[in-house]
Every structure is written in structure tokens, then in C-alpha cells.
Swiss-Prot record:
<feature type="region of interest" description="Disordered">
    <location>
        <begin position="37"/>
        <end position="82"/>
    </location>
</feature>
<feature type="transmembrane region" description="Helical">
    <location>
        <begin position="361"/>
        <end position="381"/>
    </location>
</feature>
<keyword id="KW-0813">Transport</keyword>
<dbReference type="InterPro" id="IPR038770">
    <property type="entry name" value="Na+/solute_symporter_sf"/>
</dbReference>
<feature type="topological domain" description="Extracellular">
    <location>
        <begin position="255"/>
        <end position="267"/>
    </location>
</feature>
<feature type="compositionally biased region" description="Low complexity">
    <location>
        <begin position="51"/>
        <end position="60"/>
    </location>
</feature>
<keyword id="KW-1133">Transmembrane helix</keyword>
<dbReference type="GO" id="GO:0008508">
    <property type="term" value="F:bile acid:sodium symporter activity"/>
</dbReference>
<feature type="transmembrane region" description="Helical">
    <location>
        <begin position="141"/>
        <end position="161"/>
    </location>
</feature>
<feature type="glycosylation site" description="N-linked (GlcNAc...) asparagine">
    <location>
        <position position="181"/>
    </location>
</feature>
<protein>
    <recommendedName>
        <fullName>Sodium/bile acid cotransporter 4</fullName>
    </recommendedName>
</protein>
<dbReference type="Pfam" id="PF01758">
    <property type="entry name" value="SBF"/>
</dbReference>
<dbReference type="InterPro" id="IPR004710">
    <property type="entry name" value="Bilac:Na_transpt"/>
</dbReference>
<feature type="transmembrane region" description="Helical">
    <location>
        <begin position="234"/>
        <end position="254"/>
    </location>
</feature>
<keyword id="KW-0325">Glycoprotein</keyword>
<dbReference type="GO" id="GO:0005886">
    <property type="term" value="C:plasma membrane"/>
</dbReference>
<feature type="transmembrane region" description="Helical">
    <location>
        <begin position="292"/>
        <end position="312"/>
    </location>
</feature>
Length: 437
């Protein structure tokens, strides 16, 4: 009996399975066909034999003893034409986690994560990093937003919509992830504080080494009696996060030594966001198929729409509470709602058994779709209305300048030039004094 196609009880409802009668005829176990082989012909009495093919036959014997059949599609021992009974189970196909497409997808997800983290490291300027370490406002905001607001929001949404344990773990994992490069791009488009955006993204990524497994452990207690939470691979999650430090460190080194190359890598990593999402949607949809995609509950789609929107709103409210300037409010808003979906996808793909996650592997992709669409709407509204209102100023005199340092510099220059001014009357008086001497 081949056990390669066996799946766990949790994932069994999503897959078709075949069963075969065991040789001792006392237990029904998983297998590749359904067979009652013909017994020996010792003694009178008919014995019914059903083979996997489209036929049936009778063989003599007082007490039929079932044996494993070796017949193929040809039927039983005494085939007499096609059987009037339809075959209840078709030959079992490979599960999606054993297909070559899934193995290729694993490689693609790992490569996309490395490119993203390399680009993230290339945004770090070592000369400016020390100032943020001495005044860690950005790091504190990142910790509060990414590991305070978002995990709590994901936990409350999972409880409110009564998600099962698999969907709840996928939502929690996405909510506990750090910020991604999308927030840096969107902050640039809304004239945000880029230094704050970069330091929040970097800080949340580094803090995720400790806080992400901690948040998963805290908020998963609501489903502690379920198999997937009992087998929650916190060590593998931490190891995956640690592996992201290598491309980040390489990116910091490239920025320090070769700044022009770092600028090129940042552009490539930003454009790779779009390519990664498109390829992941196509490959995952092809691999899972319509049956598994249809098994995603409607509540998961609602959470994927509402969760980034609530993250943007809570981030803006937190920045308002701290009385930050408008450009910093927009930055914190985008940093809170934008998650590193490449990291979330990689953890779901590489750390969890695929038979446990199933179609919930699609949740971070759905989240990425809606977080990008909602952030794009926010940028569009800002470009149409917000930029004009924020840059509107009162009419000033021609000589009036709002830059205090520049005004002071002009006053000093005017004072310096007055010291060197020589008038014609003074020249005549000096010449008269010299001739009298």
C-alpha cells in the first residue's frame, strides 16, 4: 500500500482519496485502488470479485479470502465486458505540494525575498543611522505600530469573523510581519518624511527577530488546542527572519561603498514588487486550481480588504496623538498599513507544512493586492487635493522670506558690506588732510 499520497486529517476534506480493502479484509486503509481479488477455487460456492477496471466476475470458493490484486484497467479474473457500475474514485493525482511547480515556487519566493531585503539594506545611510539611534523616535513608532497595533487588529478580526485555525494563523502571521518596501515608495509619492519611513522599515525588520515570534505565541493561544497551533514552527520562523539579515547587511555595505550601485538596486527592488505579486498570483492560482481557491472563506476576503485600511487609519491616528507634522503623519500611516508580504509568503511557504496551510497560502497575496490598491487611492487623493491644500501659503512681500537662517545670513552680508563702503566726500577730506601735512 503506497503511503506517499496520505494527508493529515486536517487537510483531508480538500483532497480526494482512494481506499483499498486490506489483505486481511478487516480494515479499510488508504491506497490507490479498490479491489476484492478472486479467491481460490477450492470448494463450491461463488465468491464475488470487484477489480479496479470496468468489469466484475464470479469465482468459486466456500470462504473467499481477499488478496491484493495486480490487475490493471482490464478488470478481474473473469472479465466479461464493461461493468455497469461506475468507478467511485479516479486515479489519484499528485498533491500540489509535490508538484514541480510548487518546488519552483519555493525557489522564486526565496529569491524575491532576498531581492527585497537587499534593496531595503541599500536604503540605509550609515552616516544618518547614528542620529536615529541617538534619538530613536522612528524605532519606537515602528515597534508600536507594527507589533502593537497590527497584531492586535489581526487577532480581533480573526475572532470577530470566527475564522478556523488555519485561516487565523495566516491572518495573524501577516499582521505580525514588519513593514515592507511598498511603504517607502508610497511615502515618496505623498511627500512624506523619507528618513522616518526608512528607519521605521529597517527598525521593524530588525525588531521582528524577537517580537514577531513573541506576538505569534501570544495571540495564537485562542487556538491552542488545534493541531496547527500546537505545531507552530516558531523556531523556523525565527530562522527565516535571521536569514534576511544577510541581504540587508550586504545592502548596507553596498550603500556605504558604492552608492550609485545601491541606487540602481533600490529601483530594481521596488519594481520587483509588482513583478513578484503578478507572478505569485499566476503560479499559485495554477498550482492550487479552482477547487482549492473556492475553498477560501468569504470572511478571509473581507479581512484582506479591511485590515490594511484599518492599519492606515490607526497609524494616522497614532501619529496625530504624538502631534507629528503632516508629512510624518502620512509616513506613519503608510508604514503601519503596509506589510512585508514577501516575508509573510516565504514563511508560510517554507516554515509550515503545505498540507496544513492549503489555500490559506493565498492570504498574503490578497492582502498585498488590497493594500496596494488602497494606498494607491490614498496617493491619488493626495495628488488631487491634499498637496494644494498643504502647500497653500499666505501672500508675502517680495523681500520677506520664511527661512530664518537665510534671513539672518542676508542681514550679516548687508552689515559686512556696509563696513567697506567708501564715499567720495570722505576721499576729498582725506586728501586735504594729507596735503596740509
Amino acid at each position: 500500500m503506497d503511503g506517499n499520497d496520505n494527508v493529515t486529517l486536517l487537510f483531508a476534506p480538500l483532497l480526494r482519496d482512494n481506499y483499498t480493502l486490506a489483505p486481511n479484509a478487516s480494515s479499510l486503509g488508504p491506497g490507490t485502488d479498490l479491489a476484492l481479488a478472486p479467491a481460490s477455487s477450492a470448494g463450491p460456492g461463488p465468491g464475488l470479485s470487484l477489480g479496479p477496471g470496468p468489469s466484475f466476475g464470479f469465482s468459486p470458493g466456500p470462504t473467499p479470502t481477499p488478496e491484493p490484486t495486480t490487475s490493471g484497467l482490464a478488470g478481474g479474473a473473469a472479465s466479461h465486458g464493461p461493468s455497469p457500475f461506475p468507478r467511485p474514485w479516479a486515479p489519484h493525482a499528485l498533491p500540489f505540494w509535490d508538484t514541480p511547480l510548487n518546488h519552483g515556487l519555493n525557489v522564486f519566493v526565496g529569491a524575491a525575498l532576498c531581492i527585497t531585503m537587499l534593496g531595503l539594506g541599500c536604503t540605509v545611510d550609515v552616516n544618518h543611522f547614528g542620529a536615529h539611534v541617538r534619538r530613536p523616535v522612528g524605532a519606537l513608532l515602528a515597534a508600536l505600530c507594527q507589533f502593537g497595533l497590527l497584531p492586535l487588529l489581526a487577532f480581533l478580526l480573526a475572532l470577530a469573523f470566527k475564522l478556523d485555525e488555519v485561516a487565523a494563523v495566516a491572518v495573524l502571521l501577516c499582521g505580525c510581519c514588519p513593514g515592507g518596501n511598498l511603504s517607502n515608495l508610497m511615502s515618496l509619492l505623498v511627500d512624506g518624511d523619507m528618513n522616518l519611513s526608512i528607519i521605521m522599515t529597517i527598525s521593524s525588520t530588525l525588531l521582528a527577530l524577537v517580537l514577531m515570534p513573541l506576538c505569534l505565541w501570544i495571540y495564537s493561544w485562542a487556538w491552542i488546542n488545534t493541531p496547527i497551533v500546537q505545531l507552530l514552527p516558531l523556531g523556523t520562523v525565527t530562522l527565516t527572519l535571521c536569514s534576511t539579515l544577510i541581504p540587508i547587511g550586504l545592502g548596507v555595505f553596498i550603500r556605504y561603498k558604492y552608492s550609485r550601485v545601491a541606487d540602481y538596486i533600490v529601483k530594481v527592488s521596488l519594481w520587483s514588487l509588482l513583478v513578484t505579486l503578478v507572478v505569485l498570483f499566476i503560479m499559485t492560482g495554477t498550482m492550487l486550481g479552482p477547487e482549492l481557491l473556492a475553498s477560501i472563506p468569504a470572511a478571509v476576503y473581507v479581512i484582506a480588504i479591511f485590515m490594511p485600511l484599518a492599519g492606515y487609519a490607526s497609524g494616522y491616528g497614532l501619529a496625530t496623538l504624538f502631534h507629528l507634522p503632516p508629512n510624518c503623519k502620512r509616513t506613519v500611516c503608510l508604514e503601519t498599513g503596509s506589510q512585508n508580504v514577501q516575508l509573510c509568503t516565504a514563511i508560510l511557504k517554507l516554515a509550515f507544512p503545505p498540507q496544513f496551510i492549503g489555500s490559506m497560502y493565498m492570504f498574503p497575496l490578497l492582502y498585498a493586492l488590497f493594500q496596494s490598491a488602497e494606498a494607491g487611492i490614498f496617493v491619488l487623493i493626495y495628488k488631487m487635493y491634499g498637496s494644494e491644500m498643504l502647500h497653500k501659503r499666505d501672500p508675502l512681500d517680495e523681500d520677506e522670506d520664511t527661512d530664518i537662517s537665510y534671513k539672518k545670513l542676508k542681514e550679516e552680508e548687508m552689515a559686512d558690506t556696509s563696513y567697506g563702503t567708501v564715499k567720495a566726500e570722505n576721499i576729498i577730506m582725506m586728501e586735504t588732510a594729507q596735503t596740509s601735512l
